[in-house]
From Swiss-Prot:
Residues at which ATP binds: Q103, Y283, L284, A285, D286, Q287
Residue numbers annotated as active site: H308 (tele-amp-histidine intermediate)
The protein's Enzyme Commission number: 6.5.1.4
The name this protein goes by in its record: RNA 3'-terminal phosphate cyclase
Family annotation (Gene3D superfamilies): RNA 3'-terminal phosphate cyclase domain, RNA 3'-terminal phosphate cyclase, insert domain
Catalytic activity reported: a 3'-end 3'-phospho-ribonucleotide-RNA + ATP = a 3'-end 2',3'-cyclophospho-ribonucleotide-RNA + AMP + diphosphate
GO molecular function: ATP binding; RNA-3'-phosphate cyclase activity
Keyword Transferase included in the entry's annotation: no
SUPFAM superfamilies named among the record's database cross-references: EPT/RTPC-like, RNA 3'-terminal phosphate cyclase, RPTC, insert domain
Annotated S-S bridges: none
Organism of provenance: Escherichia coli O139:H28 (strain E24377A / ETEC)
The family this protein is said to belong to: Belongs to the RNA 3'-terminal cyclase family. Type 1 subfamily.
Length: 338
């Protein structure tokens, strides 16, 4: 019998990432775990619908036995079984993030006995989670370089608080892993601005695009009007295509916050990224730790290593026989497997 790994959910940033990473790694390695103080660092601790959906999805895919899988629970015991490929559908029942549920279960399906399709309904444009376009346009091309082949499709948008969005991913088992090397970004090829609107006046998007264009030379300026029943909602994105990587940044609009202020938040974030030669942005770095660890080798450079990143590394090192090294030089941190 494999040893039970004990995790403290209050460590590091104290959020849901500890639980999601632990679920992924437990499914892959077959190691059971117990976690206490779940989301202790949040205003509303314990399992929310999004986290509970991730737990139940993981349990279904690998026939796990679970203790503590209920709303508000701050303790969970997860004993995994065998991962099975196939077609799965999960409903969050709120505007909780579809992509974070997918992020939890897809790594295990890289090792399944056949191809899979996972569809999740819930929120698609959440200020604290990567949108589907980030997964599709930024992360998945990098996963393909590692040898991981999956394809994400956004079927319907769902903004907070109504939700109702749908995201699906098709994934194939990994034949072999390659080493990812991401150093400097290189020269910028082009930058593209995009605004999504659902039940929001078009002039909001026009003002947001104008704010972006006031700071950057945009190759494309796209405004997409979605059906009213998918909102109300508004998201502003800016994609930076460079010689060695494509990065994408976004901000979700808020009630009583002007279009100019929303877009200015995005401008600030992109300028922060461009101020460093590092290829990888703060949020992408979080997503690369697990696939790189599974490959057993690789490195990337990031200007601003987040608490999320450090927490994720700590959890990965509990489950896998790998050690990460972080070396900071001239404001750029090199993250590598030692």
């Amino acid at each position: 019998m494999k040893r039970m790994i004990a995790l403290d959910g209050a460590q590091g940033e104290g959020g849901g990432q500890i639980l999601r990473s632990a679920l992924s790694l437990s499914m892959i390695t077959g190691q059971p775990f117990t976690i206490t103080s779940i989301r202790a660092g949040r205003a509303k601790p314990g399992l929310l619908r999004q986290h509970l959906t991730a737990v139940k999805a993981a349990a279904e895919i690998c026939r796990a036995t679970v203790e503590g899988a209920e709303l508000g629970s701050q303790r969970l015991v997860f004993r995994p079984g065998t991962v099975r490929g196939g077609e799965y559908r999960f409903a969050i029942g709120s505007a909780g993030s579809c992509t974070l549920v997918l992020q939890t279960v897809l790594p295990a399906l890289w090792f399944a006995d056949g191809p899979s399709r996972v569809e999740v309904s819930g929120g698609t444009d959440n200020p604290s989670a990567p949108p589907a376009d980030f997964i599709r346009r930024v992360l998945e091309p990098l996963l393909a370089k590692i040898g991981i082949h999956q394809q994400t499709t956004l079927l319907r948008h769902g903004f907070y608080p109504a939700g109702g969005g749908v995201v699906a991913t098709e994934v194939s088992p990994v034949a072999s892993f390659n080493t990812l090397q991401l150093g400097e970004r290189g020269n910028i090829v082009q930058m593209c601005g995009e605004v999504l609107l659902a039940g929001v006046p078009r002039h909001v998007a026009e003002r947001e695009i104008a704010t972006l264009a006031g700071s950057f030379s945009l190759h494309e300026q796209n405004i997409h009007n979605l059906p009213r029943d998918q909102g109300p909602g508004n998201t502003v994105s800016l994609e930076v295509e460079s010689e060695n990587i494509t990065e994408r940044f976004f901000v979700v609009g808020e009630k009583r916050v002007s279009a100019e202020v929303v877009a200015a938040q995005l401008v600030k974030e992109v300028k922060r990224y461009l101020a460093s030669p590092a290829a990888v942005g703060e949020y992408l770095a979080d997503q690369l730790v697990l696939p790189m660890a599974l490959a057993g080798a690789g490195e990337f450079k990031v200007a601003h290593p987040s608490c999320h990143l450090l927490t994720n590394i700590a959890v990965v090192e509990r489950f896998l026989p790998v050690r990460f090294g972080l070396i900071e030089t001239d404001g750029v941190t090199r993250v590598s497997i030692e």
